[in-house]
Curated annotation (Swiss-Prot):
Gene3D superfamilies: 3.30.70.360, Zn peptidases (3.40.630.10)
Lineage, top ranks: Bacteria, Bacillati, Bacillota, Bacilli, Lactobacillales
EC number: 3.5.1.47
Name under which the protein is recorded: N-acetyldiaminopimelate deacetylase
Family: Belongs to the peptidase M20A family. N-acetyldiaminopimelate deacetylase subfamily.
Domain of life: Bacteria
Pathway: Amino-acid biosynthesis; L-lysine biosynthesis via DAP pathway; LL-2,6-diaminopimelate from (S)-tetrahydrodipicolinate (acetylase route): step 3/3
InterPro entries: AcetylDAP_deacetylase, Amidohydrolase, Bact_exopeptidase_dim_dom, Peptidase_M20, Peptidase_M20_dimer
GO molecular function terms noted in the UniProt entry: N-acetyldiaminopimelate deacetylase activity
List of catalytic residues: 69, 127
Keywords of the record: Amino-acid biosynthesis, Diaminopimelate biosynthesis, Hydrolase, Lysine biosynthesis
Length: 376
């Protein structure tokens, strides 16, 4: 039997950025091969730094998928844990917990051959490159494409034992925005001979707020945030260029596309009114809204509520993003939150998960996957 805490701590020490998860993949493969040895109904394939583990069912009428992400973040860890990472990277989003739970589930579900097929996906690059989309579009699944897909994300403000989801949208769709205004630099004393890109960028940031207040239906949700502006070099030089970096978030793809359209129109309009040029990049990629399948979500919620020790919470959507949304746009499925009881939030340098969640998650989720694989 594998040691979940030891595995989690080993993974926690080797976080890697998306599509660079070579040590992580090597370690995962070591544990996977330890679990599946002498089991002829299991096959393993790799795709770049991703891993697919396929359990062929004795009847195989459908394939149930379980997805976990494996990448870390470019964050310097400040937890002071004895097993803290020391390479300027950190599993500050809890993917070390995700991977460990997935390995525990693989061990549990591979004790005997299931009736239905099972696919365990260890997906790279959730944080930066939408690895789920890359794998789907790149044909990584081949003949193993699931009929239903399930996955989780840890949530610090929920307690161990809490599982939270809903029958609708769980996470927002996100779109990254990079916008550069290009004017003409000059001396601060002679503004009439220059064209101030900083002023244009500042004007744009205020104007773009009208998208949410005047273009989006008040009953819908959207966020347009610019968290970074770079312009100028010193106090007495008018900036030739101004760079803005922001994000769009919405609970439906329709609203996301509307927001992208209006942002583009406003950027072009401001540029024209200031007689400037712009360079605008909108990058949504695979970060679509995470839309749970209502029927499958109800089934999952009823199961956790009635058949396990989980405290099932029907939770409101969150404006966080997750690239599992792309896979759920292709394959019906469900994502849910898993409580880890951490005082520090996701992406924090001090985020710490309560390791008691490992045994709980493997037991409760294992019961559900066993139900899907053998009794459903």
């Amino acid at each position: 039997m594998i040691n979940l805490i030891e595995i989690r701590r080993q993974l926690h020490q080797i976080p890697e950025i998306g599509l660079e998860e070579h040590k992580t993949q090597k370690y995962l493969l070591t544990i996977i091969h330890q679990i599946i040895q002498n089991k002829s109904f299991i096959q393993v394939e790799t795709w770049q730094t991703g891993i697919l583990v396929y359990l062929k069912g004795s009847q195989g009428q459908k394939t149930i998928g379980w997805r976990t992400d494996i990448d870390g973040l470019p964050v310097e860890e400040l937890t002071n844990l004895p097993f803290a990472s020391k390479n300027g990277r950190m599993h500050a989003c809890g993917h070390d917990i995700h991977m460990t739970v997935a390995l525990g589930l693989l061990e549990k579900l591979s004790e005997s051959q299931p009736k239905n097929n099972l696919l365990f996906l260890f997906q790279p690059a959730e944080e930066n490159e939408a690895g789920g989309k890359l794998m789907y579009d790149g044909g990584a699944f081949k003949n193993w494409l699931p009929d239903e897909f399930y996955g989780l994300h840890v949530r610090p403000d929920l307690k161990v034992g809490d599982i939270a989801t809903n029958e609708q949208t769980l996470f927002a769709g996100t779109c990254e925005v990079e916008l550069t205004f290009v004017g003409t630099g000059g001396h601060a004393a002679f503004p009439h001979t220059a064209n101030d890109a900083l002023v244009a960028a500042a004007y744009f940031v205020t104007q773009v707020q009208t998208i949410v207040s005047r273009n989006v239906d008040p009953l819908d949700s959207a966020v347009v945030t610019f968290g970074k502006m770079e312009a100028g070099t010193t106090n007495n030089i008018i900036a030739e260029r101004a760079f803005l970096h922001g994000t769009i978030r919405s609970l439906t793809q329709e609203v996301n596309e509307l927001t992208q359209k209006r942002l583009t129109e406003l950027a072009k309009g401001v540029a024209q009114s200031f007689d400037m040029t712009i360079d605008l990049k909108l990058k949504q990629g695979g970060y679509l809204p995470v839309e749970n399948n209502p029927k499958l979500a109800k089934e999952l919620m009823d199961f956790f509520r009635n058949e396990t020790k989980a405290n099932l919470i029907d939770i409101a959507p969150a404006m966080t993003g997750e690239d599992f949304g792309y896979l759920l746009s292709k394959i019906p499925g469900v994502m849910f939150w898993l409580g880890i009881n951490s005082e520090a939030p996701l992406h924090s340098q001090k985020m710490q998960a309560d390791e008691e969640v490992l045994d709980f998650a493997v037991e409760a989720i294992g019961q559900f996957l066993d139900f899907k694989a053998n009794r459903n």
